Amino acid sequence: MDKRTLFSKLPSVDKILGNDGVIELEKEYPRSLIVEVIREQIELARKRILELNESDMEGFDIDEDILINDIGHQLKLKYALKLKRLINATGVVVHTNLGRSPMAEEIKEDLWLIASRYSNLEYDIESGKRGSRYSHLEEIVRKITGAEDVLVVNNNAAAVMLVLGTMAQGKEVITSRGELVEIGGSFRIPSVMEQSGAKLVEVGTTNKTYASDYEAAITENTGALLKVHTSNFRVVGFTNTPELEELREIGDKYDIPVIEDLGSGVFIDLSKYGLSYEPTVMDSLRKGADIVTFSGDKILGGPQAGIIVGKKKYIDKMKKNQLTRALRVDKFIICALEATMRYYIEEEIAIKKIPTLRMLTYKLDEIKEKAQRLNEMIGRLGIPAEVKIEVGHSQVGGGLLPLERIESRVISIVPENMSVSRLEESLRLCDDHIIGRVYDEKYVIDVRTLFDEEYEIICNQLKSILG
């Protein structure tokens, strides 16, 4: 059989469209997309024929059933959402690459109701007049934090930029050289400050800064004192950093506002659950910060948002800033954040309902029980692999507690019929996208970050891949 004969056997687009299998596909996919994929598959087959040498042509044929099957597979890939749910088996609780914090299961009904119907986003039901989208969060945030007012924008970098742009545009903002952090993706506090229109004044050194350094740098053009919580790194050894109360005293003396950027931000004292102490939002407000900014989608366990709390007189000005409209959040964020905040009224409920907090506060016995359960389920599969429970260490992630290693339990897998790297790739690329770790020539699943329903999914994929 020569190439000309093979080319002649390629079906036309119209012929494929008339195939019963393709007619069924039209019930699921737009016809224009089907035609596009058919043309791509025909062109792909044509290229394969062109690349054939004489010895290959004898065994090569055009199988229309295989072509239709390939068309269906490609349609599924093209039409699927690019943002996919996956399984986090890494043990990093707030994994910034894997969607950060998972939200509470129970809020999905609230979200769906707001998303699929009209809402009072900017409508005051009591008066029948235009309302403010920010009013929905004011009461709950005040109740939890004790702040006078709140404003929510789309992320914490935006929150910092809005705060500085409102309170200190064209003025100097004093901050410690040791707190000029990079928050990820090459976004740095000095760059955010420059974009806001404020002028950075660095004081102190990388490892030591004193309150007197701040005071010595004050001029008639000083707009604010800024403290940045270095949540994503630690300077240890010969160090000093002024306490927030000290900056408050200086702020009062010179009538200068004090701003603290907490970065991740927490509402609960994590040291009660065996983790290192992290300043809470409430701590910062009690110690005298006029304005505190933090994230909604890290330890807090809500959607991506930059939350600004503090003195009403400053937040009122921010609400009037033209930049606020460009940075504002939509009804989904407001709904998800309000629903998440409700759990924080009672700490025990927050720990139980918010996945991030639940994962971080598991007792070791609970972790051991989770590992034993998964180990037994995998053991019943009879797969050709060495599988066992080992001691491992989880991480908080999200730029918080970078030195914290939380004792955990992992399932280590060493397959007999393929390499560990091949197993990692197969699990990552499977339909359920299981993301684990390769450590010490073993594939490792940390049970801390697994949801109960994911155990069976993992077992099914291991059985499919390893046989």
Swiss-Prot record:
Annotated family: Belongs to the SelA family.
Reactions accelerated catalytically: L-seryl-tRNA(Sec) + selenophosphate + H(+) = L-selenocysteinyl-tRNA(Sec) + phosphate
Protein name: L-seryl-tRNA(Sec) selenium transferase
Domain of life of the native organism: Bacteria
Taxonomic path: Bacteria, Bacillati, Bacillota, Clostridia, Peptostreptococcales
Keywords in alphabetical order: Cytoplasm, Protein biosynthesis, Pyridoxal phosphate, Selenium, Transferase
Species of the source: Peptoclostridium acidaminophilum (Eubacterium acidaminophilum)
Cited NCBIfam families: selA (TIGR00474)
Molecular functions (GO terms): L-seryl-tRNA(Sec) selenium transferase activity
Pfam families per the UniProt record, alphabetical: Se-cys_synth_N, SelA
Cofactor: pyridoxal 5'-phosphate
